[in-house]
């Protein structure tokens, strides 16, 4: 396979992304998910790599991962997460990861909360 063919297979254009809008895990509001890499593209190492945009007052509902874990990287905005039973503020540059624990994330700021999320298989 040529180098050119390899490079083409590594790029996914914005108009090729799957975009899903709606509530997540029983949370509040309409959340936008851009599925950056999904399914077979992840070679069964992870379930999804996505960019989420959570409007002011919206949230991803309380949920737990038992056969995988979830990592968030906050790009912009402010939020609240459940961390070992305690509600903690997060913002741009923070990393949140949840393994075998219940968690949620809520936009607590005055602008969209935008973050990258990956669900990794154990």
Where are these regions (language model features)?
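A short, N-terminal "cap"/entry segment at the start of jelly-roll beta-barrel domains
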Residues: 1-46
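Conserved short histidine dyad/triad with adjacent acidic residue
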Residues: 37-39, 50-66, 100
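Short histidine-centered beta-strand/loop micro-motifs
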Residues: 44, 60-65, 106-108
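Glycine- and acidic-residue-biased ligand/ion/polar-headgroup-sensing regions
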Residues: 67-80
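Ligand-binding loop in jelly-roll beta-barrel domains
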Residues: 68, 100-122
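Short acidic-glycine-tyrosine-enriched beta hairpin
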Residues: 85-100
């Amino acid at each position: 396979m040529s180098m050119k063919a390899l490079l083409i297979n590594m790029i996914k254009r914005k108009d090729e992304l799957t975009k899903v809008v709606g509530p997540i895990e029983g949370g509040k509001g309409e959340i936008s998910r851009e599925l950056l890499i999904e399914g077979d593209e992840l070679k069964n190492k992870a379930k999804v790599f996505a960019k989420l945009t959570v409007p002011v007052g919206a949230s991803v509902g309380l949920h737990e991962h038992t056969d995988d874990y979830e990592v968030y990287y906050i790009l912009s905005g402010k939020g609240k997460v459940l961390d070992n039973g305690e509600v903690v503020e997060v913002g741009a540059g923070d990393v949140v990861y949840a393994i075998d624990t219940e968690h949620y994330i809520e936009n607590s700021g005055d602008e969209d909360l935008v973050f990258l999320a990956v669900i990794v298989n154990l």
